[in-house]
Amino acid sequence: MSTDFTYTITIVDILPEAEGELLVNRVDLQVFRNGEGLESRLIGVKGEERPYALYRETAQKHAQVFVGRWYLDGVAKYEVVFLSLLALERRLSERPCLILHCAYLEYQGKAMLFSAPSGTGKTTQAGLWEQYRGSRTVNGDKALLEYDGKMWTANGWPVCGTSEVCENKKLPVGCIVMLSQA
């Protein structure tokens, strides 16, 4: 059995420097790429003074993750923080799948996905479908969409978001609804 990708996680007092050309520069994330196409990411949280981790790809199938010791007693208890460390969307881009920011509902044996920017009403819409149509929320924040050559399926994702609902369930995609505010 071969390994798809491996990580080495190290707790440090001082984060190493990121390497490569700066591609993305947000308050909570800086993404760099070196000449070999390998990424480094400084990962933070909005409102914090400094990043809490550095993700650095050292080969096509390996990354080092450095986590600041100061952060382990704080926000690091949340699963979303740990998943950010792994840059899973990089691994998924190598496969016929993608992560969709959405409320993922099960309705009549199929996945119904409500997607929109944060604060638009995905969770509210999911609650209304549960209340009036008998649907069930599988994940209130994300779904992993996968194409098998014939159809798209929605899969559970291990981050719950504010809904605190996340189940590992695979269903054929029935519809994707893009919400907007009036």
Q: Which stretches of residues belong to each language-model region?
A:
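Hydrophobic positions on the alpha1 helix immediately C-terminal to the Walker A/P-loop
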Residues: 125
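Conserved glycine(s) of the Walker
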Residues: 120-122
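A noncatalytic interaction/capping subdomain that flanks phosphate/NTP-handling catalytic cores
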Residues: 1-113, 118, 128-136, 143-182
